[in-house]
């Protein structure tokens, strides 16, 4: 149900989303050149503020005070990082931002499952929702922990590749565990609806396996190749966010 913007016509919501999309597209275009990249970041950030702000206010997801408080905290942290982080350390910061995006997507998908499988939720969830949530948990877990390791390697904490006997077998085992947990989630095997504390254990098994897999995938790679890894994880962060949108049916 519409919240604070209840007096506005439904078309206003569509126009706000359209404006956000235009800001995103223009921001991405500006990011293609170093001279305009700063403006591109500003346009993209403005698009995100419009999209998130309109959504949470229109559907009463958060109160305006909570929304503005979150914006202030985020702006303060971002400003502090912009001032204190050296230009040469920007790749590490970008890697951390990628990881936070993937981790946030995994948490949002988990929250959606809590809402679906809680005591007041449905006994059967749409398969498209559980499939998207499983994809989000897998990609988000790999992205978050892989990005943390990549940022640490770029920072020089552990630059050399780490190899150990049976590393490929171990990676395959955790990937297989994540896939099995995802299948259990999608087919809704072993889901308990008794209380909010026993919902969908398979999702968190999937996230845990994906998190370990993200670490195992990055530690054998040398520090010199971390920019490539971070670029790949950046794309994965976007995929996780897109999958979260499908999980939320938005």
Regions found by a protein language model. Give the residues of each.
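Transmembrane alpha-helix boundary signature
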Residues: 55-68, 80-91, 106-124, 187-195
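Structural signal for the N-terminal portions of transmembrane helices
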Residues: 67, 121-141, 240-250
């Amino acid at each position: 149900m519409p919240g604070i913007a209840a007096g506005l016509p439904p078309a206003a919501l569509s126009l706000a989303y359209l404006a956000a999309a235009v800001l995103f597209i223009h921001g991405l275009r500006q990011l293609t050149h170093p001279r305009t990249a700063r403006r591109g970041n500003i346009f993209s950030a403005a698009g995100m503020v419009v999209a998130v702000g309109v959504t949470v206010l229109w559907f009463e997801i958060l109160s305006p005070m909570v929304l503005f408080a979150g914006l202030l905290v985020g702006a303060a942290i971002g400003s502090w990082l912009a001032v204190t982080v050296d230009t040469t350390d920007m790749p590490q910061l970008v890697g951390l931002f990628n990881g936070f995006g993937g981790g946030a997507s995994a948490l949002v998908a988990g929250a959606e499952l809590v809402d679906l499988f809680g005591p007041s939720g449905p006994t059967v969830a749409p398969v498209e929702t559980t499939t998207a949530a499983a994809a989000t948990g897998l990609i988000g877990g790999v992205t978050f922990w892989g990005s943390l390791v990549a940022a640490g390697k770029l920072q020089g904490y552990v630059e050399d590749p780490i190899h150990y006997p049976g590393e490929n077998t171990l990676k395959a085992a955790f990937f297989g565990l994540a896939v099995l947990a995802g299948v259990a989630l999608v087919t809704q095997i072993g889901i308990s609806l008794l209380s909010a504390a026993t919902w969908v254990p398979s999702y968190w098994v999937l996230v845990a396996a994906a998190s370990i897999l993200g670490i195992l995938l990055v530690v054998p790679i040398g520090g010199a190749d971390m920019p490539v890894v971070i670029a790949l994880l950046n794309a994965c962060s976007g995929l996780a966010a897109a999958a979260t949108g499908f999980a939320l049916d938005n």
